[in-house]
Amino acid sequence: MRLSDGGRLIAFTLLSASIAQPGFAAKFNDLEHTRIDYPRPADLPSDAAMEAAGAVIGKIDIDVRNIFDESDQRETNKLYRLADRLHIRTKPSTIRAQLLFKSGEKYQARKLAETERALRLLTFIYDARVVPVHYADGKVEIKVITKDVWTLSPGISFGRSGGTNSTKFNLEEENLLGWGKTVQVSRGSTVDRTSNTVALTDPNVFGSHWTSAVSYSDSSDGSQRAALIQHPFYSLDTTWSAKIVGLSFDRTVSRYNLGNIVDQFNDNQSAYELSGGLSNGYIDGWTRRWTFGMRYDRNIFLPTPGTSTPT
């Protein structure tokens, strides 16, 4: 395909499902941490009995534990103790924002189990337990226990190709100051460009179930900007979702022959997405969701001064 000066490629796409947003993790993956052992009290009535009695949730106690277990001999060496001292433990308010229940609500055992699964999916949590521990006067006391992981991930890499060196430096923290937010800064240099990038992700904006993410990259040949705001289906009972995404970047693309630049052109791209979903919630053991959305993409290719039009 040959494009004339100022050629434009524009596309609209109808989405049938939302796109998951991946996260990043640095979890001492080569270590076998001790799992949380907190059994349910033997004298506590069954979940079915408490639900049938119309029990409500009373006090919610949150216990955030450090990375390593001092009571486990496998996790008591000096390196692990140093990691625990340097690590900023997750704030109880960060964990509370993830709970799918609150004091005063009707007790439902499935919400405790779902909360436990959701906590284990967080990149800054290694293990979690959500257990009813006491029942009296129609109220159930809940204990939420979590165990942190190491979340600071520095990285450096070097390479050489075609007679040119490439380097990359990266620093990522997935639980900034214990708030559950991810911040990433990086600098990379390749044969084509040198880039500096900063990104921030907040999974619970102001303690809500809204998620936001922004990033900015400044390159020697352009820049890139991206932003996301999303209200996901965060539980089986969630009745709606919404997402807005915006992305734009510009760069210079080079074509080589025997290591020499023979042609260049400017590539300007932008993309926007608006999507959402509806659900009746959790009914008779089922959750049904209907998702919809629209995506707009625009690519503009322009020759740089002194070069030919791209083909």
Annotate the PLM regions:
Residues R2-L3, L9-L15, Q21-T311:
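Immediate N-terminus of the mature polypeptide
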